[in-house]
């Protein structure tokens, strides 16, 4: 899959998630500070047909196809305030099959507004730190909290996605009878185990979720 790709390309683009989406090794924070060039994050191959993006001695097959805005919700750090940011992601078009490939920075999740790190933080706060759903919502949710502070269906939908393997597939399914808090605890513990950070659990979950997305 990396025939003709440079070492840099192999290092920068790490894996795919669904049709047409590829994740970069560059995290959201660094990406937002300086948008990488088309060459820096060009995938090794087309996400649709598998054609090498730069065949050895040949012309570029996967060419830049412009930029696209992408909304990112949630705290920018484990102790940050919830916010909504807009970043620009890169798109590429395959000259062979015409397919489009979008490259996202590490830490985003396909077809979700909240970053993987924000989701991981929420799972940690509720499952491992013992915060209520309302308290977790205040730490992560970007929308103003109304009267129903203990209701947050978004967190429940994340737990369902984890259970079905659609989100953080590295997390093993919880027992059928497990409570939502126990499900969140299992998921958060798995994410923490992936992190390089050795400080507080919230930082571990934040980093581990970005790596697991």
Go through each PLM region and give its residues.
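Short, basic interhelical loop/turn and adjoining N-cap
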Residues: 130-157
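Short, conserved DNA-binding cores of transcription-related domains
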Residues: 1-107
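A generic secondary-structure signal for well-formed alpha-helical elements
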Residues: 126, 144, 163-166
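Short, conserved catalytic/metal-binding motifs centered on acidic residues
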Residues: 94, 122, 136
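Residue-level marker of positions within ordered structural domains that often coincide
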Residues: 51, 99, 127, 141, ...
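Short, Lys/Arg-enriched anionic-surface-contact patches
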Residues: 102-118
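Long C-terminal interaction/binding lobes of large macromolecular proteins
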Residues: 2-44, 51, 155, 159-213
């Amino acid at each position: 899959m990396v025939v003709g790709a440079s070492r840099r390309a192999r290092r920068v683009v790490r894996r795919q998630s669904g049709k047409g989406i590829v994740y970069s090794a560059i995290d959201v924070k660094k990406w937002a500070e300086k948008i990488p060039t088309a060459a820096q994050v060009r995938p090794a191959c087309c996400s649709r047909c598998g054609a090498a993006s730069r065949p050895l001695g040949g012309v570029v097959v996967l060419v830049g196809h412009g930029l696209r805005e992408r909304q990112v919700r949630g705290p920018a750090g484990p102790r940050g305030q919830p916010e909504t940011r807009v970043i620009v992601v890169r798109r590429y078009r395959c000259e062979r099959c015409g397919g489009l490939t979008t490259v996202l920075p590490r830490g985003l999740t396909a077809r979700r507004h909240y970053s993987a790190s924000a989701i991981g933080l929420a799972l940690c706060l509720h499952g491992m730190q013992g915060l209520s759903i309302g308290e977790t919502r205040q730490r992560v949710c970007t929308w103003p909290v109304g009267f129903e502070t203990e209701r947050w269906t978004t967190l429940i939908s994340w737990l369902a996605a984890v259970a079905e393997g659609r989100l953080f597939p590295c997390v093993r399914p919880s027992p059928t009878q497990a409570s939502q808090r126990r499900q969140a605890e299992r998921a958060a513990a798995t994410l923490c185990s992936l992190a390089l950070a050795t400080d507080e659990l919230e930082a571990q979950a934040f980093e581990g979720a970005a790596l697991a997305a």
